Design a protein with these regions (language model features):
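C-terminal catalytic/motor cores of large multi-domain enzyme assemblies
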Residues: 1-188
Length: 188
């Protein structure tokens, strides 16, 4: 987004995925059997993002013709890297889907994207986007707004790193999440 049109700010935070990673490994076969897809950190982040957007409607909004438009639906754009470049299909009503339904939907959209079979309807109407570059080995990045959306979440790779817990050093699975948002909606 043009900075002069949409002044944007990015803020990052380190998130501990250790408990999730343990849960994921323990229940991987169950998820595969029930949903046809292994559960990944991206699925958890998409579910959490959808719920947070319901609680913070200023981020589930857009600027249309110079006016703020707060959306009633939470439709997540999910960035997918294909040979031809980046596409951002939409998971509709993500706030009403279970983690398994989101996992299955994203995987179906990814297959369609890689086979160049996404329909225009599957590419339009996102109210907020999520971009995960962790699979490419990226630790953190500044995601770019997709106007008229007012927010996008960037996800870096999960790394096992040493951290203090009291007087002990323990291994933790950490990733950096970066939120880029339009400053006109948040403290602007």
């Amino acid at each position: 987004a043009n900075w002069g049109v949409a002044p944007h700010v990015s803020e990052g935070i380190e998130v501990d995925f250790s408990r999730f990673e343990s849960y994921r490994v323990e229940h991987e076969a169950d998820w595969q059997e029930k949903w046809g897809a292994a559960l990944g950190p991206n699925d958890l982040i998409l579910v959490a993002t959808a719920q947070v957007l319901k609680d913070h409607p200023d981020l589930n909004a857009g600027f249309i013709d110079g006016a703020i438009c707060r959306y009633n639906e939470v439709n997540l754009g999910v960035a997918i890297d294909i040979d031809a470049g980046l596409v951002v299909p939409v998971v509709r009503n993500a706030d009403k889907l279970s983690i398994g339904e989101i996992a299955r939907t994203v995987r179906e959209l990814a297959v369609k994207a890689r086979e160049n079979r996404l329909t225009p309807d599957e590419m339009e109407g996102a109210t907020f986007s999520v971009s995960n570059l962790g699979g490419l080995g990226i630790d953190w990045f500044t995601p770019v707004l997709n106007p008229p959306q007012c927010g996008i979440l960037g996800i870096g790779r999960i790394q096992r790193v040493p951290r203090y817990s009291g007087n002990e050093i323990v291994a933790r699975d950490l990733a950096t999440l970066v939120l880029t948002f339009d400053h006109r909606l948040i403290d602007g």
